[in-house]
Design a protein with these regions (language model features):
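S-adenosyl-L-methionine/SAH cofactor-binding core of RNA-modifying enzymes
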Residues: 42-129
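Structured adenosyl-cofactor binding patch, chiefly the S-adenosyl-L-methionine
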Residues: 134-187
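Short, structured coil segments at secondary-structure junctions
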Residues: 26, 48, 134-136
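Short, glycine-rich nucleotide/cofactor-binding loops
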Residues: 3-15
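Residues at the starts of beta-strands that form the adenosine-phosphate
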Residues: 4, 28-29, 78
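Short internal beta-strands
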Residues: 29-35
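Histidine-anchored nucleotide/phosphate-binding helix
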Residues: 14-27
Length: 190
């Protein structure tokens, strides 16, 4: 199961580089929505992602409408927005796709209910109001933070959320091993 991650107008290349690496290591698909605050060949983007760019599934869209269309075409049943606005806590959301049959109390997987996209706004402005409205307040989620905190780093937020969704879905695709550093290419900034 591929988990779509959507970054709307990301500004900081190193954050996106980290998220590219995260997506490559988890099998998630990354969707970037223009305008971007950098070029995809930006030198600041590359070091954070090391040589993972070739392993990541990346799509760039001109606007939210095109992104939403691509998500729906890929079978996304639920689109969630991560926001600092009033919303339900991320940990209260069930991403597992498990439903319980009340007659025999058995848990089963519902294939139509576990394909969820996680949408994040830019580091500086968050998600635009129109995109949050389009997603709908029932699907607004927030990560817990202390009362005086403004926000978490974008790449940290994506990592927390992606791994929780993947955990709830049984870490589908994980083989319990890593290829190790011996196969990585060292970044050469020249």
């Amino acid at each position: 199961m591929t988990i779509p991650i959507v970054l709307v107008a990301p500004k900081i290349p190193s954050n996106t580089g980290n998220i590219i690496r995260l997506c490559a290591n988890s099998g998630a698909q990354l969707h970037l929505v223009r305008p971007l605050g950098f070029e995809l060949d930006d030198k600041k983007l590359r070091p954070a992602g090391l040589d993972y760019h070739e392993y990541a599934h990346l799509q760039v869209h001109d606007d939210w409408a095109m992104t939403k269309q691509a998500l729906q075409a890929a079978g996304c049943d639920i689109i969630t927005a991560l926001t600092t606005k009033l919303s339900k806590p991320f940990y209260d959301y069930d991403f597992s796709g498990q439903t319980t049959d009340q007659s025999d109390n058995q848990s089963t997987t519902s294939p139509s209910s576990n394909h969820v996209a996680l949408v994040f706004g830019s580091e500086t402005a968050g998600l635009p109001d129109d995109i949050r409205a389009d997603i709908g307040a029932d699907n607004w989620l927030r990560l817990p933070m202390l009362a005086d905190s403004r926000s978490l780093n974008l790449s940290n937020s994506v990592a927390i959320c992606l791994y929780e969704v993947w955990r709830q879905q049984g870490f589908d695709g994980d083989e319990g091993r890593s290829i190790g550093y011996e196969t990585l290419t060292v970044y050469d900034p020249k």
